[in-house]
Amino acid sequence: GIDIIRIFDCLNYLPNLQEAVNATNRMKKQEGRGHAQVALSYTLGDAYTLEYWADTAKKIEEMGADSICIKDMAGLLVPYKASELIKAMKENTKLPIQLHTHYTSGVAGMTYLKAVEAGVDVIDTAMSPFAMGTSQPATEVMVETFKGTPYDTGFDQNLLAEIADYFRPYRDECLKNGL
């Protein structure tokens, strides 16, 4: 089943998220499962300083969330800004932080590299047949990037290749049909 409930408001207005966090926490208490993950919509602008993100992370922790996901839907987060962002948020919260970015601007893999080095706990990837473009970086590439480092996943590249080979015909069929 699904245990991580990603809770999102496109304006990052935390009061809109409180009831969903509460409901997830009730489920966790009653059924022994459920993880309230508050997703923040990453964006640019004068209001979105490192202090804004760090303070918001602390407020999310105080809401009772289990983790935070930074959702960079437009691929705006660049590598060194990701490093600064993760460090600032980690200084203000003990919650695990997940990063979800898109390859739209072509820097997502490098952004993940710097975010991991800065202490992000989880990165979202996609198997190579579905990766890149407006999707996430390829799982296989990120696994190889971290091989032999303190961030080594231990994933088997041969198994990942089998998984990619399995899904490639489905991707090709979708492309053939204009999806």
What are these regions (language model features)?
Residues G1-L179:
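Catalytic cores and adjacent flexible loops of soluble metabolic enzymes
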